[in-house]
Regions:
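Short acidic/His/Gly/Ser-rich catalytic and metal-binding motifs that mark active-site loops
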Residues: 44-50
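Substrate-binding/active-site clefts of carbohydrate-active enzymes
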Residues: 1-14
Length: 250
């Protein structure tokens, strides 16, 4: 796609020459790392060129072929590949549902993983699927999605956001710490591979607006049930700024 600087042709051998060279740079820069982040999210233009059309494969199949190739590269170089999982969910038609806050009764009526079930053989088992949910991860649909991953024996890591593109610079409600706490509890309950906190610069380029979100991830990632949000805010204000509880400046 000439209009895109972040997408690739999975049927072009030169794609892998470029990507693997970039991956090698990353491995050299981080020689003691455990993972290799391969990306793969938010793709809109795979399968549009003549080379891909000639394969007779769908855009989803082409992307999963790419995923298999880059995962093998990661494994061959002693790393665990991480792939952001939105594209398979979009292919299956459950992406918007997974993001929604629909009730359990509403979700039951429309939940359908048939396409994912049929394509399960395309999902590399050595890959960690980064399940990103920047708002409330405890919704019924999202819980069902985590159950699907578990039932299929796939490895999953959670991703929260200390800042996201749709969140203002200031104020950021509780620095999104309730979302961090909720997802961290799900990670513990479902024995996922781990959790991380992203911070997107389109949400704010200023670190002071996201530090409390990072600290919340450290707090609740280790122990999601130790403190409630108000207790966390008070502890943060005392330790980071020296505020006293009676100051009411949390």
């Amino acid at each position: 796609n000439p209009g895109s600087d972040w997408e690739f042709c999975p049927s072009d051998p030169r794609t892998y020459e470029v990507q693997f060279d970039l991956y090698l740079d990353a491995l050299e820069a981080m020689p003691y790392g455990k993972y290799l982040h391969v990306g793969g999210d938010e793709i809109t233009a795979i399968g549009i060129d003549d080379r891909c059309k000639a394969t007779g494969k769908t855009a989803f199949e082409l992307q999963m072929i790419w995923l298999k190739n880059v995962c093998q590269f990661a494994v061959d170089h002693g790393r665990i590949p991480i792939f952001w999982d939105d594209m398979p969910l979009k292919y299956a038609g459950i992406w918007e549902l997974a993001l929604s806050d629909k009730s359990e009764e509403e979700v039951v009526k429309v939940w359908n993983t048939d396409k994912l079930d049929e394509a399960i053989g395309l999902f590399p088992k050595e890959c960690v699927y980064m399940r990103w949910k920047y708002e409330d991860a405890t919704t019924p649909a999202h819980r069902r999605l985590l159950e699907w991953y578990h039932d299929k024996g796939l490895k999953v890591m959670g991703a929260t956001a200390a800042s996201a593109g749709d969140s203002p610079f200031m104020p950021r409600r509780n620095t999104r710490s309730e979302y961090v706490k909720g997802f961290s509890q799900l990670v513990a309950d479902n024995q996922l591979e781990g959790i991380l906190a992203t911070a997107w610069d389109d949400g704010s380029p200023h670190l002071e607006t996201v530090w409390r979100g990072f600290i919340a991830q450290g707090e609740f990632g280790w122990n999601p049930s130790a403190r409630d949000i108000e207790a966390f805010k008070k502890a943060h204000a005392q330790r980071e700024y020296g505020f006293r509880p009676e100051d009411n400046r949390m």
